[in-house]
Every structure is written in C-alpha cells, then in structure tokens.
C-alpha cells in the first residue's frame, strides 16, 4: 500500500508533512512509499530465512523446504518467535531498570522517593515480604523481582498474579513459565538453525515466554513505577502538536522508560530552574511527552511544567520539524534513525540510554539511577543554551491541541466505580456496557494513513456500546483524536453514553502504555474472579489495529495464551503456511480459549469483535 493524499488521521501531522516534504527532508511517509516496490513477497509471508550460511532460503510450492529441510510452518513460526524474543528482551530490560531504580531509591541514592507507600506494602505482602521500614521493604521487593525474573524455577510473580484457572491450564499445556530470562534462553536456543523445527513446539515456547513477559516482567515494572512515581489517577492533560510553544525552553522525552523524564520534571518544578530559563529569554521551561515515555509520565503527572503528549512514534519527525524543541532525550525504543537529520530544525538529539545510538551520535547521557539528577540537570543546561541559539522566527506554532482525560489504572477504575466492581459487572450484565475491548496497539502506515484504522475501530466500538481501554501508541492516537475526552461521550451508543455520564468517564479509558498489557490482564482477572468464570468466558477481547514492532507481537501471543480473541492488523508474516495460520486462528482456541483474528478493514474488525462479545454474553446467559 502506498500512502497518498491524507497521510494521517490528524490535521496537525498532515500540515507538518506538507512542510517537511516541500523542504525535501527525509520523513517516514516518503521513505515508506519509496519502499513499496522493493518489498519481498516471501518475507511478507514469513517464507524467507537468513539464519545460516546455506541461505538465504525462500520456500515456494516447487521448493517446499529450506536447504536444511525445514518446512513452511517451521520457518514461518520460527521467524515469528525471533520477533517475539526481541519484544520480551525490551520489556525485561525495562523491568530490571525499574527494579534497580527502586533499590537505589531505597538506599537514598536517587532523586526519587517512594511516592505510593500503600502500593509498596500491597505488593510486598503479595510477594510474602514482611517489614515496617519503607526503604527496607522497597529494597527487598527490588531484590525479589530481579531474582524472580532470573529464576530457574516456576515464576513466583506469575503464580501470584495469574488467575487460578489459567495457571491450571498452563500447567496442563506445559507452558507455565520459569523466570523470563530462562524462557528467553530456552526460546533463543530452540530457534537456532537445526534445533526446534516443529511449529507447534515453537509456538508453545513462545506462549510460555509471553506469559513470563506480561504476568511477571510487565506487572512488576509497572507496579514499581507506581511505587516510585505514583499510581495513575484520572486528571486532565493535553495532546497534539499544539502543546509545543516556541517561546518556551522545550525538552522532549522519547522512548518507553519514564526515569529521566520524571527527574526532569522534578527539577523543572524548582523555581530557580524556571528563573534560569526566563533569564535566557524564554517564558519558562517545559517537558514535552513523546510516545511511551510521554505516556508513562502523562498517566501519573499533573504538573504545569509537563505540557502533555504530542502523539505516537510516527509523529516524532513532524514534531521536531516545528522548530520548537531544544533537546530530544531518547531512551529505549522508537527513536527513528533519521532524527540526526532533524537537528537542522534547531534540536539537539541526546541519547539517555545505553541502548540508543544514532548515526553521528556516538555518545549519550546514559541513565543510571544514581545519576538521574545529574543527567537531568545537564539536559536542562543544554536546552537553555540551545534556546538562546534557536531561531524562534522559523518555528511553527501548531494550533491543534486537545484536552484529554488520562490515568485510568485498575485502582482508578475501581475508584470511579466508588470502590465497587459490581457497578461495572451490573452494567455488563444489563447490557449497558456490551463488553470491553483492550486496544493495545502501535501505529503503522502499512494498512492506511497514520492512526486511521485505530481511530475508526475505536469509534465503531464505542458506538456499539463497547467500552475501550486504550494502551500503547494506539492510546496516543485516540488522545489526539479526542476520544479520551468527555466530549467523546456523545459518540458512544446510547447505553454506554448513559454509563459514562453517570460515572463521569470517557468511553475510551486511557489506560497507559503497551507495558500496561500485564496490568490490563490483572484487571481482567479481577473481573473473572468476581464472576467466578475463566477468562475466555468473559465478553472481553483485544485489538491491535496498527501493530508495528516486536513488543506488539509478544503482547498478542500473551493475549491468546490468556484466552482472549485478539484482532490484529496489518496481516502478520505468517500467511506462508496454512498450518501456521490454522494454528493461530483456529487450533489454539481449543487449547487456550483465545485466538487471532486478522482483518484489515477496521469497520469489519469492529463487527467481528462485537460478534465475539455477543457470543460470550449469550454463553453466559446475559
């Protein structure tokens, strides 16, 4: 597919694309279109392998195996597991960084503090950790998490957070995981040349790894971030490029980890920092949220120094092209290799993770918990100096800006229900809320203009009285589209509209990042436990209408293992094998209760998800 005409669902991006394109600057849309005729049809189906020196091999009807003898199903699923491993590795890296930060904070070595003491005590109690001293508890929790993620035995975190019926099933299927590091070792060693070529075996190992990823690494890291930075609670903020004001010193925080961003906010809230910015000629200094780092902060922080979120990963080039950003602090995930080119717009690109390096940018201010304040101060000094040099007359002040409501963690949802989950359950039983769909998605150009499919499917779902929980880059898409605002209530079906007005909530609940998949699974567990049913029986489904990268694939595998019907688009690279397609879309449902549904038309996808939910309701007799 080639993107022509409107490149994005959002007018701000369409406008900035026109500017960048006219100036002849490399950008994601033009690069995507340039690749249209060069894409390998074998790769798109998962039928190309480059693992060993005997290849590359491509499978076709007249050449049904690779040189080693692997068939289409084995090749397709093995290729898919490689993507899944990368997603697991990134989530696990983040979890270890969170645990290290918690321990260093407990030892008094960071700029942070234990912000949610009750969450710490709750988590420690679940882990079987006792003690009265807050810092001692925090240190023990950090040690527990690091140990469990490395465990050779069954994961204690999975034991604690997974539903009983799921644990029994996973044991029966042989996919109950050990620590996530061990799962990575098993998966990686299996997916080498001439080791495991059985597509069912590879898929089961991927499921085991996905459970360790989402029910251990993800839940642990988000809980730790709640402990350190506060559990998300509903509050208003802003989205879209209009949050960028060229008259301010603007520091963008980009990636998936909130650590440096939170340190920047803590410093920016000091009057002497704001005064320093004003002396440089600025109105003040602001922190600007980009993609998941911005989303992590957005869910937790309500501060005048945090301007909000510009959008998801496809937005970053166009946001920098406004000429409003002074420093772009890049942590793990989703920093485009093209960004050094965008320094022509007056921004300084600074990696703040050892994972991130770019062409011509060989060094960074790599995050270490003990150095967070020092790193943040250096970034602020860089930004203020950059502001003095930046040509404000060339900056573009974008008008589009949305007021949004964010911060709907499980605790926040319970609070909105006055602490009584039965309010939600009764609404579902009566049909006022037909069901719930978790929208956990990236953004891509592969299936149409930027964010178009995501916005369309969300609008269709709420119109059908289906409540949406939004996570990931898809969450930012819906924020910029205004669907996480109270104004969006008018777009909902009559029954859902009444519920939203009664509870004072939007029809799309801004739940967090892709890392909140585990947190969403825990909320689903609470609902299943309250109803006394297993997860697959619930009128709940998942959609990833614009999945893009490796974190998304491991999240999807987990959703299926958890027992949820999971819609994905664009078409994943598994279609080269009928056996593999049948495994993911049919056979697995007989084992876990979950399955993959592939549909690129967002309207048809919404219809399919509604049908799934109605079938679940009928089976429950509601």
Curated annotation (Swiss-Prot):
SUPFAM superfamilies reported for this sequence: Prismane protein-like (SSF56821)
- Which Pfam families does its entry note? Prismane
Co-factor note (free text): Binds 3 [4Fe-4S] clusters per homodimer.
Q: Which residues bind [4Fe-4S] cluster 2?
A: 49, 52, 57, 68
Q: Name one GO biological process term.
A: response to hydrogen peroxide
Protein keywords: 4Fe-4S, Iron, Iron-sulfur, Metal-binding, Nickel, Oxidoreductase
**What cofactors does this protein use?**
[4Fe-4S] cluster; [Ni-4Fe-5S] cluster
Recorded hits in InterPro entries, A to Z, give: CO_DH_a-bundle, CODH, HCP/CODH, Prismane-like_a/b-sand, Prismane-like_sf
Listed EC numbers: 1.2.7.4
Annotated binding of [4Fe-4S] cluster 1, by residue: 40
Q: List the disulfide bonds.
A: none
Catalysed reaction equations from the record: CO + 2 oxidized [2Fe-2S]-[ferredoxin] + H2O = 2 reduced [2Fe-2S]-[ferredoxin] + CO2 + 2 H(+)
Q: Which family does it belong to?
A: Belongs to the Ni-containing carbon monoxide dehydrogenase family.
Q: How does it assemble?
A: Homodimer.
Q: What is this protein called?
A: Carbon monoxide dehydrogenase
